Every structure is written in C-alpha cells, then in structure tokens.
Amino acid sequence: EGLSGTGPKAGGPLYLLRLLSQRPADALARTFADADRATPPEAAARNRQLPALSALQQWAQSQGNAALASTCQRFAQETQSGTSRTLPGPTGERNVYTLAPRAHVLCVATSVSDLLVQTAAVLASGGKALWPTAQASLRNQLPAAAQAQVVLQDNALTDASVALDAVLHHGDGQALQAVCTALAQRPGPIVGVTAMQPGAVDIPLERLLIERALSVNTAAAGGNASLMTLG
C-alpha cells in the first residue's frame, strides 16, 4: 500500500464495483458471500466498530426518525470494514486480505437528513466524520459513542494540515464542482469524492474502505529466520 511495484495500483476486488452502471444495495456484502460460507472471515475488529453505529440507530429511533434507523441497520448488515480473510496460496506462503476504514471522511450536505446518513456510513466503516462547526448543536444531540466519531472541522477542503481520506457529497452539480476544484488544489494524495443526489441513502460503503493484502513467507519464517531480513 502506497509503494510502487509490479502489482495492481487501482485496488483489489472492490474496485470492480466502480465499473458498474447499476448495482444492488447489498453489493458489498454479496461480493464476499460465497467465500465466507466456506471460510468465515475474522471479524473481531469489525465488531468493535459497530457500537457507535448502533448508538446512532437507537438515537434515531428515539427521535422518531425511522428512515435513519433503518439505514443504520442496513449499513450494519452490509459493512465489511475490519474483516480479514485468508486467501488461497502456495505452500510456504500466507496471504491475508484485510479491509480497513478510511480514517477521516468529510461529510458535505445541505440537509441534516443527508448529513446523518453520511455519518451512518462513516460509522459503519469505522472512520471519523468531519462536520462543519456550524453543526455543533446537532453533534451535541448525538449519543456519546457517536459523538466520539464526529469531529468538528472547518476548511477541511482547503487546509492541507487537516487529515482527509475521502469525501461524501450530497448536492447538485455546481456544488460538487466547487468541492472537486478545492480538492484538486490540495497537495498530497488524491482524495476520492463520492457524489450523490440529495436524499440518496444508498452510499457505496466500499468507497470508505482501504484494501490491504499482506503476504508472509512462512517457509522462511519457520526455517532460517535470517532470510526474512534479506532484500
């Protein structure tokens, strides 16, 4: 990850979902369904990430916001963040595929409902949602577990000192163009933008994940350990 080499640069299997003109809402979960039936993934890290989303769901129910509560429940079922899978490989080699969260996600929306849906997606993925300080009063209404994952931050688009790994945007084309223009002027790695129409709730959770594949030479590790230091 982040290094040059001969392997794929765009990403792993989740990248294929970007090539679809249409996709089912549960596309992320279905991607791994067949393999997981044979060998269940390691999901301890995933389970540690879900309490914040569960707290947001319970809060939505207490506020009479059935739509947000339903979205939280669906995201909890679909998210694959924090899961690890051992891949098939040759003897003497162990390959592990892990999905990790994009740590800092900027939420850009003109309505509170869209902002909360974006936040639910970020919590489902295990990251932190960046909100404008103008939404401080709304943040204060959230349960403590959800509040801990929401950071108030202005100028995240233009301030290069602010860590930013992804952007969720609900709005029209003109507003989206302004966001993309600001991001293009930021130094450092390219930050991806997921754009949706106002009111959309089918946020592609895979856009908030990082795919990591780790290969370990178990033959060398179990034999002459000094071989692991050569390179």
What are these regions, as identified by a protein language model?
Residues 119-125:
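Conserved short alpha-helical elements in the N-terminal third of ANL/AMP-binding
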Residues 1-104, 108, 112-113, 125-128, ...:
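C-terminal segments
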Residues 118-119, 180:
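Short glycine/serine-rich donor-binding loops of glycosyltransferases
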